[in-house]
Amino acid sequence: MSKTGGSDSKNTLYCSFCGKSQHEVRKLIAGPTVFICDECVELCMDIIREESKSSLVKSRDGIPTPKEIRKVLDDYVIGQDHAKKVLSVAVHNHYKRLNHATKHGDVELAKSNIMLIGPTGSGKTLLAQTLARILDVPFTMADATTLTEAGYVGEDVENIILKLLQAADYNVERAQRGIVYIDEIDKISRKSDNPSITRDVSGEGVQQALLKIMEGTVASVPPQGGRKHPQQEFLQVDTTNILFICGGAFAGLDKIISSRSKGGTSIGFGAKVAPVEERRPGELFREVEPEDLLKYGLIPEFIGRLPVLATLNDLDEAALKQILAEPKNALVKQYQRLFEMENVDLTIHEEALGAIARKAIERKTGARGLRSIMEGILLDTMFDLPGLEGVEEVVISKEVVEQNARPLYIYADRVGDAGASA
């Protein structure tokens, strides 16, 4: 860190690009007659990354290879190697199919929508968001729990297409090549195995409504959203080439898979029964079959529209520690950047990262719960820090996470804990 003192303004050095002084930045790098600060270096790196990403998308007639897709996914998503491989191939084939359709009319290639099955906080949403970013296509997310059949209180299925159109700045052609991610898809499972005589408007009814847009139809979308009115002019959007990715935690599906796999085992005193607890849900999900999803409550036609199944594993302590520190947008890096804005270094010990990961596992929230744990740990520090002078570094140890101890504050001239400086 380049922090030189001295009150003489003549000796103060400035960044040649943003004009900040050496006292306002962490590092000032000297070149022949010019200086550049660490913030401008980061900005340049971001610009280069974006340009290299766009050149990746433009290569090979606009379709990145599965290996190229996987490489970018690795930068943002830790672990889940099987799911990343399945998604990379499926997405590559989908956009290759679109290019094929415009050039060859002899063989029609069917669309392969994707089902993501994995525990809460395992990275389903992040995978879908990252895919859209790689391919530079419009992307929208929908929550299946808010959807109802047309004519009932709730959100129409066709509103999903409206959101995609908005993401494409109302460019219909771009929207027709976009990606839709529908979360909590397991929550619209049929309420019982047997079809009911009463209308299931938020379960089977939504599955039926989604079928039409997933297989390909021309949706009439009201430009300003909401319910349709006879006087409105509608935008016509063909959903044939829109890639649908559905994700869900499918709580209890592991038990259905386990009971099926043990269906042929013997009974009695000599029977060897492996307890379900020996295998985690993520491991069992790898063995999922369409019949398991049918038993869970998805209708056969809906399962048929999602031929590509990608399963995600539970995240263990090692994976959660990696998620905290390693990706380009890792949580630790985000909080370090926030502290940098106060000219303070944030140091989190390796043991503290492990303690944070264990807390997330105990809460059964996966990676999704990491931010709330970090917020709780750093809340008092972030509240006090703007009003403190002379703090150069804040150190988070394992005791801060596990025993609610106070973080260590390192001042320019002394060391003290948060309590001593409050």
Swiss-Prot record:
Domain ClpX-type ZB: 3-56
Protein keywords: ATP-binding, Chaperone, Metal-binding, Nucleotide-binding, Zinc
Statement: the UniProt record of this protein carries the keyword Lyase: no
Residues reported in the UniProt entry to bind Zn(2+): 15, 18, 37, 40
Gene Ontology MF terms in the entry: ATP binding; ATP hydrolysis activity; ATP-dependent protein folding chaperone; protein dimerization activity; unfolded protein binding; zinc ion binding
KW ATP-binding (keyword) present: yes
UniProt protein name: ATP-dependent Clp protease ATP-binding subunit ClpX
